[in-house]
Regions:
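Nucleic-acid enzyme cleavage-core boundary/entry regions
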Residues: 1-244
Length: 244
């Protein structure tokens, strides 16, 4: 598959997945077409003959596969390329692209799973299910299911924290990784703030008994420190020492 084939097919699939036909609310038959001179601005440039030939060869290959239908002028210029919906599954397979319909199914399963965990997730998940029915994107989902489910898992557990807990300890308790929460903190806070009832986004985590990890004091150079009767001589250390 050439880069031109890939680009053409992805543009056509994007149009299809963003349409009413995709969710079955279209009242008329829709077609999904792209103009090559819009996709490749130099396609009709006489000085770019190599590009013209390469694009046309790619289009011919797609026609041969049965993926597209084209309108071509007598001079060889391809006027338009239209997606053949009858072979849409083969197009996905050819591209190695996961159908949006499959992604939607998986997202719905996750949202339904977490919907009844607490009031915040009830509001958030209900809204995202509505957005999916409207063919809109799911807020805070960036095409990574593992990260997304980690976000929802944190939101499901964070309202249950009774005692003051460091972020890293909470991260280990819920996700089994001391640094995992840090990577998704901003999205977790956004969901909590937008779908919960908190007066201040900045203090939201503290209101839920989740506090920042303790800082560290670094010692280096000449000096001595006595702790519990034992003396530490910094001058004998090759590097620095951190105490939390």
């Amino acid at each position: 598959m050439t880069k031109y084939e890939k680009q053409i097919l992805n543009v056509l699939i994007d149009k299809y997945e963003g349409s009413k036909s995709f969710i079955g609310t279209n009242q008329v038959n829709q077609s999904f077409t792209c103009k090559l001179d819009q996709l490749f601005p130099k396609y009709k440039d006489d000085s770019e003959y190599d590009l013209f030939c390469a694009v046309n060869e790619s289009v011919d290959a797609l026609v041969e596969e049965g993926f597209v239908i084209v309108k071509k002028l007598k001079n060889g210029v391809v006027q338009s390329v239209t997606l053949n919906l009858e072979d849409i599954n083969k197009v996905y397979e050819y591209l190695g692209r996961i159908p949006k319909s499959d992604i939607v199914v998986d997202l719905k399963k996750i949202l339904i799973l977490y919907k009844d965990c607490n009031a915040i997730l009830s509001a958030y998940c209900s809204r995202q299910l509505e957005r999916l029915s409207e063919n809109k994107s799911v807020e805070f989902f960036d095409d990574d299911f593992d990260i997304y489910e980690s976000i929802l898992k944190i939101v499901s557990k964070i309202t249950e924290v009774k005692n003051e807990t460091f972020e890293r300890d909470f991260s280990i308790q819920v996700l089994g990784d001391s640094k995992a929460f840090e990577k998704i903190r901003s999205k977790v806070v956004s969901i909590l703030y937008e779908y919960g009832d908190f007066p201040d986004k900045e203090t939201l985590l503290a209101d839920l008994n989740i506090v920042k990890n303790p800082g560290h004091v670094y010692f280096k150079g000449k000096g001595k420190l006595t702790i519990c009767g034992q003396q530490i001589d910094f001058s004998q250390m090759p590097g620095d020492m951190a105490i939390s």
